[in-house]
């Protein structure tokens, strides 16, 4: 059913609001989409979400409806569910919202060795060879004492000064510890509204990208024994009780996705602890301890003579970069859950799969996977 026929069908229904609006409308004036009655508009958007609200590229129709005007945008945000419940990535803000609870969002990463860049795509089919929909891009910047990974919404504009800037990840000198920074401002940031536009400007006195949201550490292999890498991720903004009680993770509101410079691309969760990368320091007396992720223990395959994990067909090439992360339920005892929150693996020379789920977001999962690309001889 076309959009024109849909409107004709809705107008033919006996509805007093529609007739009232039609009686007062001037036929000589051009029709304004913002003047549609709310009841009619809601039914239209619900049908668009139902019919064309599947996977990409058909989902672009939902995004197009949100860009018509303010009234359409407000209703669209009420109708479209967050990825946690819909398993769909619709707007840019979805990349900083928690993944689905009962499944994993299947993505893949393409590496460009020449430009030291990494592109994240959403898998459109179950095949590992589809083109996918572009989600995020990252660029590797080597410095004297560390390495930075700049993460952006645009592949052609990866910089901290860009409106598409999401955040960054910085490693230490050895490449064994990483800190993920969100591009949002802290509570001390001053927000100013421009007189000439609706864009929100941030005071330059507060540097961007200085808000840590996760710490990643790789265990040093001082004895030189061969085996899979051991990593641990402390998610500063996600409490451990979220996984245990199946609660709701505080995430960015979708109400402001209309502005490029607004916090549409920013998360507003507050850190639960001070900067630390050890499990023993994850607890605090001020509230719930943060979520800790650790490698799922692999098993040794005697016939293949290698360490094995069940990726359910999503990984085809053996590599030390491959991993599956699960929640650590008891830091002191080292107990872990069985539910996989993030898995990453190699399927080609410069092709990797990335599947993530609740309670982490695509941005957090992408940053964790980027740390696996860093060369660290002490951990091999």
Swiss-Prot record:
GO biological process, one term: protein ubiquitination
UniProt pathway: Protein modification; protein ubiquitination
One Gene Ontology term of the molecular function aspect: transcription cis-regulatory region binding
Record field: compositional bias (Polar residues): 272-283
The organism's place on the tree of life at top rank: Eukaryota
InterPro entries: F-box-like_dom_sf (IPR036047), F-box_dom (IPR001810), Tubby-like_C (IPR025659), Tubby_C (IPR000007), Tubby_C_CS (IPR018066)
Tissues and organs where the protein is expressed, per its UniProt entry: Ubiquitous.
Induction details: During imbibition of seeds.
Alphabetical keyword list: Abscisic acid signaling pathway, Ubl conjugation pathway
Keyword Phosphoprotein: no
F-box domain residues: 30-76
Segments for region (Disordered): 258-283
Function: Component of SCF(ASK-cullin-F-box) E3 ubiquitin ligase complexes, which may mediate the ubiquitination and subsequent proteasomal degradation of target proteins. Confers sensitivity to ABA during seed germination and early seedling development.
Family stated for the protein in its record: Belongs to the TUB family.
PANTHER family: TUBBY-LIKE F-BOX PROTEIN 9, TUBBY-RELATED
Name of the molecule in the record: Tubby-like F-box protein 9
Species this chain originates from: Arabidopsis thaliana (Mouse-ear cress)
Gene name tied to this protein: TULP9
């Amino acid at each position: 059913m076309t959009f024109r026929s849909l409107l004709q069908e809705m107008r033919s229904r006996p509805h007093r609001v529609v007739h009232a609006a039609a009686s007062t409308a001037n036929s000589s004036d051009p029709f304004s989409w913002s003047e549609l009655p709310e009841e009619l508009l809601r039914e239209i958007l619900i049908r668009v979400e139902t019919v064309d609200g599947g996977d990409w590229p058909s989902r672009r129709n939902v995004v197009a409806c949100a860009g018509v005007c303010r009234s359409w945008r407000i209703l669209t945000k009420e109708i479209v569910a967050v990825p946690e419940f819909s398993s769909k990535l619709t707007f840019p803000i979805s990349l900083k919202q928690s993944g689905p609870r009962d499944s994993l969002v299947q993505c893949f990463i393409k590496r460009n060795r020449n430009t030291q860049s990494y592109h994240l795509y959403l898998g459109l089919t179950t095949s590992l060879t589809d083109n996918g929909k572009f989600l995020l891009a990252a660029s590797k910047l080597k410095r004297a004492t560390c390495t930075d990974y700049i993460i952006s919404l645009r592949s052609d504009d990866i910089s901290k000064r860009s409106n598409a800037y999401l955040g960054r990840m910085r490693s230490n000198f050895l490449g064994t510890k990483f800190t993920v920074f969100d591009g949002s401002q802290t509570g001390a940031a001053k927000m100013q509204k421009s007189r000439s536009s609706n864009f929100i400007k941030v005071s330059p006195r507060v540097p961007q990208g200085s808000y840590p949201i996760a710490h990643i550490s790789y265990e040093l292999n001082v004895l030189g024994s061969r085996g899979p890498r051991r990593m641990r991720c402390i998610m500063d903004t996600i409490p451990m009780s979220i996984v245990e009680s199946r609660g709701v993770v505080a995430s960015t509101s979708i109400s402001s996705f209309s502005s490029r410079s607004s916090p549409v691309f920013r998360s507003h969760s507050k850190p639960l602890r001070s900067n630390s990368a050890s499990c023993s320091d994850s607890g605090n007396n001020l509230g719930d301890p943060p979520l800790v992720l650790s490698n799922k223990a692999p098993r040794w395959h005697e016939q293949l003579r290698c360490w094995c994990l069940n990726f359910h067909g999503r990984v085809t090439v053996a590599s030390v970069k491959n991993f599956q992360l699960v929640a650590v339920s008891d830091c002191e005892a080292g107990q872990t859950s069985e539910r996989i929150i993030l898995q990453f693996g190699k399927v080609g020379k410069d092709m990797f799969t990335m599947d993530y789920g609740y309670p982490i977001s695509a941005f957090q999962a992408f940053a964790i996977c980027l740390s696996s690309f860093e060369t660290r001889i002490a951990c091999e």
